[in-house]
Regions:
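Structured mid-to-C-terminal alpha-helical surface segments
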Residues: 1-15, 26-34, 38, 42-248
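Glycine-rich beta-strand-to-loop/alpha-helix junction loops that act as flexible
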Residues: 17-22
Length: 248
């Protein structure tokens, strides 16, 4: 479905991919966790109906049928389904943000290839530089209660060539005046560390849990690398090595 969307001229020129599936299937050499939803953001503010029509046509070519279309605020959700060969149902959801058309960086293209006994193809996928992907991921970590966001940030900060300064600059760009401060992030993350659902969210999604991954250590890294760059942040020595947790 990712490749079919990227090969469609109308959709390729309008939809830019981001989110967990994009991170693990497109940006990383080896996917580290499972993500079923395909997240996109639009380049323009024109009507959405022609693109939904085109999505239906693309889905039909790969044997999927639209089971639901829903719009909630700035998000349009299109759910596709099909009967799996081994029984059960295949479900894919395309989530499109129709409001955020002002990007921080120029978009890029990354070639993606699928070669299996069922289907093969390749295409250049429109997406964002990894720093901007992590800006969105940092916002998601703050706004929702999903441990997968912390895992993805930890993974990028420890294994990829990302710039904390660029991540926070992109965050400021996307959130404008509503960007959270260091004390707000500190309290937000501290509360989430005490939530069992947040801590175990990643377990059902992970391909193989890295031995070095630890929820507390991941939160410490986020505060040291990104939190320190936010408004009202104390000196790094008051944040590092988990000391930010004792100040809450």
């Amino acid at each position: 479905m990712i490749i079919e969307i990227a090969e469609n001229e109308l959709l390729r020129d309008e939809f830019v991919m981001r989110g967990g599936t994009c991170l693990h299937k497109i940006h990383l050499k080896e996917p580290r966790r499972y993500s079923e939803d395909l997240d996109y953001v639009r380049r323009t503010n024109t009507g959405i109906k022609p693109y939904i029509t085109e999505l239906r046509a693309v889905a039909d070519r790969v044997g999927l049928a639209v089971s639901n279309v829903d719009r909630s605020g700035s998000m349009v959700h299109v759910t596709f389904g099909a009967d799996a060969t081994g029984g059960g149902r295949i479900r894919i959801k395309v989530e499109t943000n129709i409001a955020e058309t002002d990007f921080f960086n120029k978009t890029i293209e990354i070639e993606h290839e699928v070669d299996s006994r069922w289907w093969s193809g390749k295409a250049k996928i429109p997406t964002f530089v990894l720093d901007e992907m992590m800006s969105t991921k940092t916002r998601a970590l703050y706004q929702r209660r999903k441990g997968r966001d912390l895992f993805d940030l930890w993974l990028a900060l420890t294994s990829e060539d990302v710039s904390p300064e660029e991540i926070v600059a992109g965050l400021r760009h996307s959130m404008n005046e509503s960007i959270f401060t260091y004390p707000q992030l500190r309290q937000n993350l501290f509360d989430k560390l005490a939530d069992a659902g947040f801590r175990t969210d990643i377990e059902a999604l992970i391909v193989a849990m890295p031995d070095e991954y630890n929820v507390e250590n991941a939160a410490d890294l986020v505060m040291e690398k990104l939190g320190r760059l936010l408004e009202n942040a104390p000196p790094l020595e008051e944040i590092a090595d988990g000391r930010w947790r004792s100040m809450t």
